[in-house]
Amino acid sequence: MLTELVDLPGGSFRMGSTRFYPEEAPIHTVTVRAFAVERHPVTNAQFAEFVSATGYVTVAEQPLDPGLYPGVDAADLCPGAMVFCPTAGPVDLRDWRQWWDWVPGACWRHPFGRDSDIADRAGHPVVQVAYPDAVAYARWAGRRLPTEAEWEYAARGGTTATYAWGDQEKPGGMLMANTWQGRFPYRNDGALGWVGTSPVGRFPANGFGLLDMIGNVWEWTTTEFYPHHRIDPPSTACCAPVKLATAADPTISQTLKGGSHLCAPEYCHRYRPAARSPQSQDTATTHIGFRCVADPVSG
């Protein structure tokens, strides 16, 4: 069963920020047309339905192309994906390779490797999906992925606040999204009841009634990443064509939005609508998922 769509009216808003990270600038006015967005990220159960109906094989389940990785040992080109692995203690936060490992056999069915499964995670957002996997699901569903502008417009929920829920990170001490609780990357206190992804819909909706726009998993958009916003005319801010057909291009990075359960104030203060991060199209990880959008039905 596909996720319920929430109709958004479209309009103009101030996109970006100059308060946190340089790639979020400049602040600029963007206009998006009316569209509909899925209320929550695509879940494991929904992605399983897609795979069952189509026989689709994700990027993480396919051997790596030796031509794209010259000099890499053939034994290291087996199917797999990136898995977050907590460190034993405090580390230099400038080197992400200390807490990310390439794990053979990791994929959406086995997000942490061959010995893991999703038997008790049907309602969690699907992870270990690369960009073409998200595009394929969206096409099957008769939908598409959002542009970065559409995603940020939806996440803001009709406000100009710093966070999707207001200007305070923890209003009244309340945790508003599934983000890292403890000291990154070695101790997660599990204060929210989960260490890792949480079932969708466990936190308050934003002003548009959308769930999990912030935290839990980063979400793919169709917008290629540049180290600052590219200012496009308002008429082109929505519905950018998806250039990808059936294969990922590791030389192209897409823009991720929303932050994830691995975001912490001291490392990745990106659990905000304006925040953005690059990710190569061919990479699947334990903290990236997606949701779809749809255009209004004409008639």
Curated annotation (Swiss-Prot):
EC number from the UniProt entry: 1.8.3.7
UniProt GO molecular function: formylglycine-generating oxidase activity; metal ion binding
Keyword Protein transport: no
Cofactor binding note from Swiss-Prot or TrEMBL: The catalytic copper is required to activate oxygen and catalyze oxidative C-H activation.
Sites where the protein binds Cu cation: C263, C268
A Pfam family recorded for this sequence: FGE-sulfatase
GO terms, biological process: post-translational protein modification
Pathway: Protein modification; sulfatase oxidation
Name of the top EC class for this enzyme: oxidoreductase
Cofactor list: Cu cation
InterPro entries hit by this protein: CTDL_fold, Sulfatase_Mod_Factor_Kinase, SUMF_dom, SUMF_sf
Function: Oxidase that catalyzes the conversion of cysteine to 3-oxoalanine on target proteins. 3-oxoalanine modification, which is also named formylglycine (fGly), occurs in the maturation of arylsulfatases and some alkaline phosphatases that use the hydrated form of 3-oxoalanine as a catalytic nucleophile.
Family to which this protein belongs: Belongs to the sulfatase-modifying factor family.
The protein, known as: Formylglycine-generating enzyme
Annotated source species: Mycobacterium tuberculosis (strain ATCC 25618 / H37Rv)
